[in-house]
From Swiss-Prot:
GO molecular function: glycoprotein-N-acetylgalactosamine 3-beta-galactosyltransferase activity
Subunit and partners: Associates with core 1 beta-3-galactosyltransferase (C1GALT1), probably not with the soluble active form.
Gene3D superfamilies assigned: 3.90.550.50
Gene Ontology terms describing biological process: platelet activation; platelet morphogenesis; protein O-linked glycosylation
One Gene Ontology CC term in the entry: membrane
Transmembrane segments: 7-26
Mode of membrane association: Single-pass type II membrane protein
Any coiled-coil regions, as ranges: none
Family: Belongs to the glycosyltransferase 31 family. Beta3-Gal-T subfamily.
Protein name per UniProt: C1GALT1-specific chaperone 1
General function of this protein: Probable chaperone required for the generation of 1 O-glycan Gal-beta1-3GalNAc-alpha1-Ser/Thr (T antigen), which is a precursor for many extended O-glycans in glycoproteins. Probably acts as a specific molecular chaperone assisting the folding/stability of core 1 beta-3-galactosyltransferase (C1GALT1).
Subcellular location: Membrane
Amino acid sequence: MLSESSSFLKGVMLGSIFCALITMLGHIRIGNRMHHHEHHHLQAPNKDDILKISETERMELSKSFQVYCIVLVKPKDVSLWAAVKETWTKHCDKAEFFSSENVKVFESINMDTNDMWLMMRKAYKYAYDKYKDQYNWFFLARPTTFAVIENLKYFLLRKDPSQPFYLGHTVKSGDLEYVSVDGGIVLSIESMKRLNGLLSVPEKCPEQGGMIWKISEDKQLAVCLKYAGVFAENAEDADGKDVFNTKSVGLFIKEAMTNQPNQVVEGCCSDMAVTFNGLTPNQMHVMMYGVYRLRAFGHVFNDALVFLPPNGSEND
């Protein structure tokens, strides 16, 4: 009898462990079981099509785009924080910094946790609860990321925010396709709405990734969004080049010089790039100079659209 009881207890323990593993793997593999969705690549609008739009409609389009920027920071990032605050975030319609703790040097929203997934969850909930009626696109980035917000708005020009968009640089991990946080993550207001509805459902969007191992915050986000029927989309220009980049422009140039020495510019990156990552504070300011301040005398830029800065903005 004792032997049978011992065998029974061993069976229960092994069964429990097996069920836990299956549950965790289920979070990663839910795409095939719950939803049928074939990943596709989204491209920026054609410039010729934009030129066909009347000037009045173009002005209305440029005014209608409202992008709210979320930057996740920690106290150790203070020099990067300062650079981001002084450079590209001025071009967001509104930008706020979400920190792991109170930092006296800069204004931020305290998430009171060092866990990046919890920070991301709390930041998205805060943004949705407070700004769901003001902004239709939400862009999240690391403090090592440089973003050209005007290029982001151009890319989103013909995309309906009432549809569930989840955009950026996609990466595949097993059966899970997710947008890498290194290149920045874009969610439409519809995706924010669906995500917000799942944040309080631990069975579908848990605060912790698992009992045995922990997955990164961008993978956690993809798991939650899959349950909401929202899937990762890779953002590209008309030539199929990525516009959300997980590396710095300097690294891309070095790679192009090695791999395509006769076509460095063509082999580097998209003319309509939205983000680059892995930048130092000094590189942020150099990028700002190159993107917004340097101009060739006598050269006229014939942009079909002009995205106006928010009222009171100090952007370049």
